[in-house]
Amino acid sequence: MTRLSHQDLRRNFRQLLASDTCYHTASVFDPMSARIAADLGFEVGILGGSVASLQVLGAPDFALITLSEFAEQATRIGRVAQLPVIADADHGYGNALNVMRTIVELERAGVAALTIEDTLLPAQFGRKSTDLITVAEGVGKIRAALEARVDSEMAIIARTNAGILPNQEIISRTKQYQAAGADGICMVGIQDFDQLEQIAEHLTVPLMLVTYGNPALRDDKRLAELGVRVTIDGHGAYFAAIKATYDSLREQRQIFTQASDLSATELTHTYTQPEEYILWAKEYMSVKE
């Protein structure tokens, strides 16, 4: 079987961005899931930062995973992946210089694209965990990412949260990220097509949405018309794997013979123990939710 190189996969992803179709990502978190996604015909995969934290650390999504840990997981996936994989690179693991290091490591890992978000991470003392950095800092990160990139086929996508600022501010941010050279804009927090249309009409680069399966956005034709080329609908495959593991091990121990009535979300909550992290953040950092 002919294997596609990392550059082949990056070119394939560029073709998706240049198309007039909206594609849905498969959540890939290890080599096996990447192979399964490709075998089932998914055109693109996503390695989520939250899923990587669960997979590598068994910890909730509190920006605890390091660049090295994330890049190692991306490398494992990149060795076998035969579909383009987008890496959710969070905030680039620091300032603009850290972003440059992030680009080097993830390009070497073989990802086809990556997102750099403008959330203030990790949570800062006395600040809300959803605060955004300034536009100027966000632009600096995108420019630094482009400078650090060697393979121009690897897409650099700027990500922002459209759910916590007025539309006009989101339009201003995304236009500046576009002007800085971002290959695409990723948005989380879009509520409906009215909001999406108001923002999208000001942008010319391909769009990517984190929808988490929002029913108000379930119209691929309309999404495509508005420039959306990729949607991230969540990481259901990963949580289903947690549920299946729990049920299988419990049955093996013969404690019960029927499947658990706990949901995957409840199981994830139980075994990542987020209450401890929330307590520590409040105690030592005065983080405000």
UniProtKB/Swiss-Prot annotation:
Magnesium found in the keyword field: yes
CDD domains associated with the record: ICL_PEPM
Catalytic activity: oxaloacetate + H(+) = pyruvate + CO2
InterPro entries per the UniProt record, alphabetical: ICL/PEPM (IPR039556), Oxaloacetate_deCOase_bac (IPR023687), Pyrv/PenolPyrv_kinase-like_dom (IPR015813), Pyrv_kinase-like_dom_sf (IPR040442)
EC number: 4.1.1.112
GO molecular function, a single term: magnesium ion binding
Cofactor note: Binds 1 Mg(2+) ion per subunit.
Matching Pfam families: PEP_mutase
Cofactor(s) it depends on: Mg(2+)
Gene Ontology BP term (one): pyruvate biosynthetic process
Positions contributing to substrate binding: 50, 159, 235
Keyword tags: Decarboxylase, Lyase, Magnesium, Metal-binding
Protein origin, superkingdom: Bacteria
Residues bound to Mg(2+): 88
Subunit composition and interactions: Homotetramer; dimer of dimers.
Similarity section: Belongs to the isocitrate lyase/PEP mutase superfamily. Oxaloacetate decarboxylase family.
Role played: Catalyzes the decarboxylation of oxaloacetate into pyruvate. Seems to play a role in maintaining cellular concentrations of bicarbonate and pyruvate.
Protein name: Oxaloacetate decarboxylase 1
Organism expressing this protein natively: Pseudomonas fluorescens (strain Pf0-1)
Taxonomic lineage: Bacteria, Pseudomonadati, Pseudomonadota, Gammaproteobacteria, Pseudomonadales
